[in-house]
């Protein structure tokens, strides 16, 4: 069979496809060039692309024309001649059936590979889209370089002494993390004083204000000074000796001694009760020493 006959047999009338050089090229071209349609149109295009199917269609048309002419008692010799030629073509094309079968299996394999490639392409496109979004969320290289240059300039301007001073200020409000060493005692450099410093300060204040702490409530400053001066005079000069006789008699009155300081009059029972109350009110808890801290 010549190339012209093959091209004429492989070119269907219902499809706009160009003439193919052979049966295999015709079938491959038809499968790769048709646009997506429904299943019936796809199957029809596949059948029209096969030369044997086209020969069968022509054989059926020629046989129908010949039968019609014979029924009218006017036999058509051209239809009979065309029928004989088509029959010879069909006989010669029967040897190409295994080739068509091989082409069909190859097409099915290519369709499966194409479907697999489409799925992988869709997956790759999805990953590329995610990577694109991640890259858009990152800062630009120029921006990062500008920020690094700015930070470097700022570091160059900061002096080490200023940095150390700032670190010392921060250290007063920070401490070692508890996960580092829980048993270690941190530095006592807080902005508030420690407890021992507070105790020493309270004792110093008490020593400065000893007169106020030792004075009785309701007593004036002059009387307090006189009382303190009298106590000092008693401790400085010889005291008045009191002797108690064995028979339980009255105490003897001591000799008179002039010191230049007026002694206070003897206190009565009411005054002694007031003094006792004052002593009770003066009982201040000034023992702030804690030996456990040293």
Swiss-Prot record:
Which GO cellular component terms, listed alphabetically, does the Swiss-Prot or TrEMBL entry include? Answer: core mediator complex; mediator complex
Q: Which residues form a coiled coil?
A: 99-125
What does the entry give for GO biological process? Answer: cellular response to heat; positive regulation of transcription elongation by RNA polymerase II; positive regulation of transcription initiation by RNA polymerase II; regulation of transcription by RNA polymerase II; RNA polymerase II preinitiation complex assembly
Q: Which UniProt keywords apply?
A: Activator, Coiled coil, Nucleus, Transcription, Transcription regulation
Keyword check for Nucleus: yes
Q: Which Pfam families match?
A: Med4
Q: Where is this region: Disordered?
A: 1-23, 214-294
Q: Which GO terms describe its molecular function?
A: RNA polymerase II core promoter sequence-specific DNA binding; transcription coregulator activity
In which compartments does the protein localize? Nucleus
Protein known as: Mediator of RNA polymerase II transcription subunit 4
Q: What is the lineage of its organism?
A: Eukaryota, Fungi, Dikarya, Ascomycota, Saccharomycotina
């Amino acid at each position: 069979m010549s190339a012209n006959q093959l091209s004429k047999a492989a070119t269907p009338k219902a499809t706009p496809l160009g003439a193919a050089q052979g049966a295999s090229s015709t079938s491959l071209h038809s499968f790769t060039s048709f646009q997506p349609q429904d299943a019936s149109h796809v199957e029809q295009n596949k059948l029209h692309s096969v030369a044997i199917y086209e020969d069968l269609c022509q054989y059926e048309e020629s046989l129908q024309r010949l039968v019609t002419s014979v029924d009218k008692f006017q036999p058509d010799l051209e239809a009979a001649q065309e029928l004989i030629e088509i029959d010879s073509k069909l006989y010669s094309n029967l040897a190409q059936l295994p080739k068509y079968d091989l082409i069909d299996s190859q097409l099915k394999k290519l369709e499966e590979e194409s479907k697999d490639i489409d799925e992988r392409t869709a997956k790759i496109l999805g990953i590329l889209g995610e990577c694109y979004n991640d890259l858009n969320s990152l800062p630009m290289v120029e921006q990062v370089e500008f920020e690094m240059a700015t930070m470097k300039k700022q570091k160059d301007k900061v002096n080490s002494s200023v940095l150390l001073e700032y670190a010392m200020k921060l250290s007063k409000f920070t401490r070692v993390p508890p996960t580092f060493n829980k048993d270690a005692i941190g530095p006592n450099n807080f902005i508030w004083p420690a407890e021992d410093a507070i105790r020493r300060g309270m004792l110093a204040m008490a020593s400065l204000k000893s007169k106020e702490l030792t004075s009785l409530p309701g007593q004036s400053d002059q009387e307090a000074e006189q009382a303190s001066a009298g106590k000092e005079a008693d401790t400085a000069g010889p005291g008045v000796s009191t002797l108690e006789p064995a028979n339980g008699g009255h105490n003897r009155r001591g000799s008179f001694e002039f010191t230049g300081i007026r002694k206070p009059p003897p206190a009565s029972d009411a005054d002694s009760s007031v003094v006792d109350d004052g002593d009770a009110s003066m009982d201040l808890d000034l023992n702030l020493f804690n030996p456990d801290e040293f």
